[in-house]
Each structure stands twice: as C-alpha cells, then as structure tokens.
Amino acid sequence: MAVRSKSSKAWLHEHVNDHYVHMAQKDGYRARAAYKLLEINEKDKLIKPGTVLADLGSAPGSWSQVAAKLTGTSGAVFALDILPMEAIGGVSFIQGDFRENDVLAQFEGLLNNRPLDLVICDMAPNMSGNAVSDQARSFYLCELALDFASQHLKTGGSFLVKVFQGAGYQEYMAAMREFFGTVQTRKPEASRNRSSEIYLLGKNKR
C-alpha cells in the first residue's frame, strides 16, 4: 500500500476543504478553475454574447463551460486539447495537438472565416517535481499558445494565459508586448495564495 507524502496529504486536506471546490461541485463546473475565469471576466468583460473564442488545453473543460454560458448561441467556443474531454453543449472540441497541421485545418474549418475575438489558455505541464524543468516546460506551452494567438486572433483581439512567475516570466511578458497594445496581470482570488501562477492578459492585438 502506497504511503502518501506530507505534501500530498496537505494538498488533499486543502482540496477537500476548498471553498471553490465545493462551489464547483454545487454549480456543476468540472474544476475550481472556472471561478478564475469568471472573476477575470467580471473585471475585463472578455467574454460576452457573440464572442468567438478558442480555449487551448481545455480539458477537463471548466473554462469551456464558462465560455459557452457567457457567449450564448450567438457566439462560438472552440476547445482544443491533446487529452480527451467530455462533450459540453455549445462547445466544438478538437482532440489533438494545436501545432499539427491537421488539427489547425479542423479548427480553421470550424472557424469558417469568422474573426477570432479571444484566445484563453489555462494549460500547465505535468509537473515532474524538478522546478527548473517544470518552469521551462510551462513557458514552452505558453510560447506555443502565444504563437497560436498571434496567428489566429483578429486585430484588436485579446489573449489570456496562465503563467508561473520565475525564470522566463519577464521575457515572456516582453514577447507578449510585441503583439498586444497592453499587457496586464491578473491574480484572481480563486488562485491559491501559495501558487506562483498568475494570468497575463494581452489586449488590442496589433
């Protein structure tokens, strides 16, 4: 029988007693991360009826759930992930790597020449426990997301991405500023205090 480490026991205790976990269960969201997007959207009004957006690294789907509710039938939500994701009403899901040509072709076919207003990305790599390696892998995913956003967003569009503060953070912010008129930071209350995660919001794509 496996013995839990102190850190995993602490995480389990925190998870079981987490206010946002209980809210997610009550409200029908697949993960507590839904409230991060809801809080950011309350401030920045990124998603509204009619918004056309892509959710990168969407599984298990809580951000796509929020997006589908906020865009309504007049908008469109495209979710992409290499992992499987259970269907969500109002969400077009593509399973695959968004760097691959066949996946991009599927996405562009579904987009059908509509302007893309917003790209959201809450991706994180599977953590190995090696802080240096994990940080590098995290920013690699962020760079891929920025590349996708820079290629597909309409002029004036927005990009919301999760990053972890540390090595590479300032360089990534500088890269975002090349593509967006403004780059702002967001730390929603639903983000755990001990976490180094923060959200970068690029507005007014050039």
Curated annotation (Swiss-Prot):
- Catalytic-site annotation from UniProt: K162
**Molecular function, one GO term:** rRNA (uridine-2'-O-)-methyltransferase activity
Where does it mainly reside? cytoplasm
Question: Where is this chain's protein located in or outside the cell?
Answer: Cytoplasm
CC per GO annotation:
cytoplasm
> Which Gene3D superfamilies does the record match to this protein?
Vaccinia Virus protein VP39 (3.40.50.150)
**What residues bind S-adenosyl-L-methionine, as annotated?**
G61, W63, D81, D97, D122
Give a single Pfam family match. Answer: FtsJ
Q: What class of enzyme is it?
A: transferase
The alphabetized UniProt keywords are: Cytoplasm, Methyltransferase, rRNA processing, S-adenosyl-L-methionine, Transferase
Keyword Membrane applies:
no
Matching InterPro entries, A to Z?
RNA_methyltr_RlmE (IPR050082), RNA_MeTrfase_FtsJ_dom (IPR002877), rRNA-MeTfrase_E (IPR015507), SAM-dependent_MTases_sf (IPR029063)
Catalytic reactions on record = uridine(2552) in 23S rRNA + S-adenosyl-L-methionine = 2'-O-methyluridine(2552) in 23S rRNA + S-adenosyl-L-homocysteine + H(+)
Q: Which protein family is it in?
A: Belongs to the class I-like SAM-binding methyltransferase superfamily. RNA methyltransferase RlmE family.
HAMAP family reported for this sequence: RNA_methyltr_E (MF_01547)
Name of the protein: Ribosomal RNA large subunit methyltransferase E
Q: Which organism is it from?
A: Neisseria meningitidis serogroup C / serotype 2a (strain ATCC 700532 / DSM 15464 / FAM18)
Its gene is rlmE
